[in-house]
Amino acid sequence: MRYQVTSVLCIGLILCFSIQPVEIYWCDVDIRFTESICGVSVVAFLMLMWRRQRIFLSAIDIIVALWFAYVMLRAYIDSTYPCANYILRVMQMMSLYVSLRLLFSSFQVSEKIVIFAILICAIYEVFLGADQMINGYSRHYLFTITGSFLNPGPYSVFLSMGLVMTCQMKKELYLGKGVVPSLVSYLPLAFLILLPATWSRAALLSAAISLGIIYRNQWKRWRWWGFAGIVIIVTVLYFLKQGSADGRSIIYLISLLCISHTPIFGSGIGSFCHQYAEGMANFSSNYPTFNFASADVTFNAYNCLLQIGVEQGLIGICLFVVLVSMTLIKLRKNTKILGTALLCLLIFSMFSYPFEQLPYQIICVLIVAYAANDVADSIFSTKWHIFCRCYIAPAVLCSAVVLFSIFIHKQIRERVRAESDYRMMAGVSHTAFIDDYYELLPLMASNEHFLFNFAKILAADGRYNDSNAMLRLGSLTSCDPMFYVIQGNNYGEMGFYKEAEAAYKKAFNVMPNRLYPLYQLMLLYEKEGNTKEMVDMAKRVISFDEKVVSPATKGLKKKAIIIINRNKQKNRK
């Protein structure tokens, strides 16, 4: 009994971090999470020693190890892009996986414990979201419901997962009679009521597909009506948020083009934003009549397969597909409830970015580690020496987790401190902070806001080459065209007009629905004294159909009109 309680406490401790407030950058939660992983691995190792249990190697373990080794090797061989944060997270998740494998090997944890632990987290998010709607507060001023997240998109995954898990549970398990079973039987309604409030099409679609699979036998005779209903619903959802859907279609198209350029090994870990900007620039210059109205700055592919394909190539995609397939097959045999939850999460990841959020990384690793814990599918289990399986292998794995945790803990603490220092001086753009920015640079090289602000401060101090160096570094981590616009400004200040012109044109090609790069080109031609190009660009600015009409864009067009009128007056004279 005590081992079961210990296992439940360890699982609960890990899952507690899936309901903590999610932040964009490193925070204290990540520090505590790393400490918890280390603690769980030590506890699991002691339980293994005390109970004299043996660990075994499964096929899932091999795929996980191969994928981890490939990512680490890929990042080591090609260090072009700042990817330290990504690698730290990968190491953290690998440490979590090994810790959970040790835990599940030390004691046979019931599937119900894992299921109810995840459901408790989902129910907590339901109460949190309902409280936000009732009391009118959330973590984003534009949305009424966000849960522990910064927007309702990722939050909706908890609701869709909770919905499909409870529906699968009602179908498979006999809950009995009484107050508690009755309450459990109505749990799907709690998730179903809040899910539409998130306005997440990906969550609705993933829930609908998962529920269709769960109840496939019941609706076989109505399948054509069901397909027709799905088509109608998808069409309605598309037109409700057409701009967003069109924008993601552009992201998918450019991502596929990026994969085609480096199909086998990908462009490198952490390369997506830069490759997306380069791909967009090439595509827009070759197809200028394409409708780019819905294009926008993005930091991910909104599709985990495409994200992996761009950075890791077909090798990464194959490892991901094999791992997912093996896990789903294993869960289908042993525990369909967890398999349904993972399937819902995977479907959602085809349209969004749940695997970039710590809560879903934790849940995914937990489910995969549980699926790998099947003695029937163990590899080399009879050939390993008993002493090795009982003592040496657990000791090596636990030591590796502890060493990884110490390294990760130190790195995250330094980055949390650097983020705190940057926030204190981010609102003050003064050249007195240049030395402080240089001191933080090694830890903040993947923070595009830090690099952009640093570049502006250097430019204000007249250090244009240093500013451009920071902007080039920023363009490796962001596809924001402003990194190229500021480079053009710096080149213009130094009198390098050809380089400035190239930078402005690159900025426009990266985001062809932005007016500002064309406006800067117009001013550059005016500064050069190139009247013909200036007038042509002014006319282009005036006729430009911008994505969002605002006082700023009206001001830019007004300036272009003034330039044209001034040129006409000069010609009359």
Question: Each PLM stretch: what is its role?
Answer:
Residues 442, 472-476, 506-509, 543:
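Conserved structural position within tetratricopeptide repeats
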